[in-house]
Amino acid sequence: MRPSGSTNFITHADGQFHIRWFALDGEINLCGHGSLGAGAAILSKYQLESVVFNSKYGEVVISKRDDQYSLVLPSWEAKPCAVPVEISDLATDAIDVFSTRDLVLVLPSVEAVMNFQPDDDRLREINEYHALIVTAANGNSGYVLRYFAPQIGISEDLATGSAQCSLAPYWFKKLGSDALNARQLSMSGGYFEVERTTENSITVFAQSKRRAIAI
């Protein structure tokens, strides 16, 4: 399995911070956890309470709350879709399928998400989507997920903030709550708290650990 994660490039010009995110094989169009890590570094270095990153995909706002960081992200509408024929045999257990930037398979249980076996070669063939996400309800207060994006060099991501743009609005509606927790069942595990901010945005709360930094 190839390593997960992103490399974040930040520039500071005309009083503004600009950010771009890259994986091994390409540029990421929005990286939530990468933004959290970059924001944590900037907030610490400049002793700020919040920071706005400008990107070609819009503004990303990072703030600190106790020992966590908050990230305001867009809320993406779930659109019903068919399972691409290339991965139809991977989705035989799916109880729902929808698309946003990503293709999302809703599975019947936490165990089904844990046991899901991806195929990188076939996932690369469905390049109309940024990634494949598998998800399931985790009781009445949250959901679990796994995130696969081999098209940009990420076999399985460890912690994916931007995946909540696809998943949180869906689970807000299904579970009847505007505040949920999300667990990413990757090798190292990821944990998020998500809240509905407006009809068009969510707030993601998470901790951040930086592996390397150069400012």
Predicted regions and their residues:
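Active-site proximal loop and beta-alpha junction motif in alpha/beta enzyme cores
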Residues: 1-30, 34-215
